[in-house]
A protein has these predicted regions:
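Nucleotide-state-sensitive switch-loop elements of NTP-binding domains
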Residues: 3-12, 17-136
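Alpha-helical segments flanking ligand/cofactor-binding loops in enzyme cores
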Residues: 28, 144-145
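Short histidine/acidic/glycine/proline-rich micro-motifs that form metal-
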Residues: 132, 159-160
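Short, flexible, solvent-exposed loop/turn segments with mixed acidic/basic and small polar residues
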Residues: 1-2, 212
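C-terminal accessory "lid"/substrate-recognition subdomains
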Residues: 145, 149, 161-212
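Conserved beta-strand/loop subsegment of P-loop NTPase cores
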Residues: 37, 92-93, 118-127, 146-158, ...
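A broadly conserved amphipathic alpha-helix scaffold signal in soluble, globular proteins
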Residues: 103, 107-110, 151, 171-174
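Charged helix-capping and loop-helix junction motifs
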Residues: 138-141
């Protein structure tokens, strides 16, 4: 009997960074046709309306156990196990609240691994390119945690930035994380395959995404 491992992607980032838009891109381009569950906690940007998801054949499980980072491993693990038992999804996307620490969310998922066949595929942080420096200065602890623990960093709003600004932003992020794949190409110009490749293969293919 083949055990299907559910892949989990965590999409972190501050409120307004563009997480919801990126998740829509993932759902439409990358995970189309897969059994997918999106878990967002109620403080997230609930910009994805039920209708959109139902059309895509995705069931929404609302987590009302409060902010993942507050309840940490307690309720979150229970909710995640319930989702896995009920839906047996191929993929779970978790959108923690804006100030959630990525390391805490990843630790909570690792905790569930003992009882369930899951693996973390990507720890993705979406960063508003125009605000990265301001976030670092003002919300250092949370923002650094999201950047340092990411396997892929997606810079949003790059279509409105000069190349110098984008380079400065990449440099700033690289100081905190020299291993993650950094995608600075506007997402709508990337194919689903390119995005999937970035999530799965990490830093090997950085050359594809460096913005010229």
């Amino acid at each position: 009997e083949v055990i299907n491992v559910t892949k989990v992607d965590i999409i972190s980032g501050f409120l307004g960074a563009g997480k919801t838009t990126f998740i829509k891109e993932l759902i439409e381009k990358v995970f189309a046709g897969e059994k997918l569950v999106l878990i967002e906690n109620e403080f997230g940007e609930i910009g994805i309306d039920g209708g959109f998801l139902q059309d895509a054949g995705i069931e929404i499980t609302e987590m009302n156990s409060g902010c993942i980072c507050c309840t940490l491993v307690g309720d979150f693990s229970v909710a995640l196990k319930k989702v896995l038992d009920e839906y047996h999804p191929d993929h779970v996307i978790i959108e923690p609240s804006g100030v959630g620490k990525l390391s805490d969310v990843a630790a909570a998922i690792e905790n569930v691994k003992e009882d369930a066949d899951i693996e973390i595929e990507g720890r993705i942080t979406v960063v508003d390119g125009k605000k990265a420096k301001m976030y670092l200065d003002n919300f250092g602890e949370f923002f650094e945690n999201q950047v340092e623990h990411a396997s892929t960093i997606v810079i949003s709003r790059t279509q409105n930035m000069t190349d110098e600004k984008i380079e400065a932003c990449v440099h700033l992020l690289r100081e905190k994380n020299d291993k993650a794949t950094i995608i600075s190409t506007p997402w709508d110009q990337l194919s689903g395959d390119a995005i999937r490749h970035a999530l799965e293969h990490g830093a090997e293919i950085e050359g594809l995404f460096e913005h010229h």
